[in-house]
């Protein structure tokens, strides 16, 4: 008489029932399901951390913004800047210079309301791809806020404060006024603040007297004024000019032929020595 070995019975914790031991496919399915649940849990926790961090920086940034406008109210910003000696109004700026600045610094300047999600997303993609985290996505309005209301230190709370200020500035002023304030307060290197000082200091001219090549090279300096100053690094200033020209072509403010002609003029530019 043969003995039949009884089938092994186990308790399945997944189905919560008794039965034969799970096979290989069942085990793999259980492992994959566990890993999927673990991944979803990690992603959910990461999302919660991001939301909490975003909320923290938004609240902290708004406090910084409120503190800044106690010192310099938004509604007094234009009168404060436009009353300065050497202020250059929009009507006295060459169109080539205006086009060059917008192309180089904020190509969507006329379309956004102070903060540009498209530029921020594009800058983030560039930063992640290069690993440099050099692109900030700041609009001209945000740069104006940074230069007039805040310190130059870089941290997320200050970036949030800058955004709050930019939105408030856009509600208070039109685009021409914002552009005026921006170009009259930015630093051009060699001790020159504002387009009026820069045009006079580098070329001995008023902004309207600038040639197109001179206007374009000045538009590129504020990106890194100490590095691009024509007095100390004329070659770098010309290289930066080429970047601006390429962006003007990309924004359809110049044809490639016009840009090449201006680039050829760069080698003939005469800069006044630093005073």
Please provide the spans of the model-predicted regions.
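Juxtamembrane regions of bacterial inner-membrane/periplasmic proteins
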Residues: 3-275
């Amino acid at each position: 008489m043969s003995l039949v070995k009884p089938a092994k019975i186990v308790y399945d914790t997944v189905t919560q029932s008794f039965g034969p031991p799970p096979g290989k496919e069942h085990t793999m399915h259980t492992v994959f399901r566990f890993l999927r649940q673990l991944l979803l849990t990690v992603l959910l926790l990461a999302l919660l951390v991001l939301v909490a961090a975003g909320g923290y920086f938004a609240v902290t940034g708004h406090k910084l913004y409120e503190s800044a406008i106690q010192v310099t109210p938004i509604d007094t910003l234009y009168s404060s800047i436009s009353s300065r000696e050497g202020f250059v109004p929009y009507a006295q700026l060459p169109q080539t210079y205006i086009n060059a600045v917008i192309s180089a610094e904020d190509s969507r300047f006329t379309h956004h309301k102070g903060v540009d999600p498209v530029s921020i997303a594009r800058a983030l993609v560039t930063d992640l791809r290069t690993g440099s985290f050099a692109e900030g996505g700041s609009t001209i309005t945000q740069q104006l806020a940074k230069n007039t209301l805040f310190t130059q230190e870089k941290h997320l709370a200050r970036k949030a404060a800058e955004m709050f200020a930019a939105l408030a500035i856009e509600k208070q002023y039109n685009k021409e006024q914002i552009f005026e304030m921006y170009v009259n307060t930015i630093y051009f290197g060699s001790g020159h603040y504002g387009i009026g000082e820069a045009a006079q200091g580098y070329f001995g001219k008023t902004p309207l007297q600038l040639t197109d090549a001179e206007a374009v090279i000045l538009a590129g300096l504020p990106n890194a004024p100490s590095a691009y100053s024509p007095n100390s690094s004329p070659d770098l200033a010309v290289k930066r000019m080429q970047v601006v020209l390429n962006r003007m072509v990309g924004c359809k403010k110049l044809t490639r032929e016009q840009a090449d002609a201006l680039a050829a003029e760069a080698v003939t530019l005469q800069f006044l020595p630093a005073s």
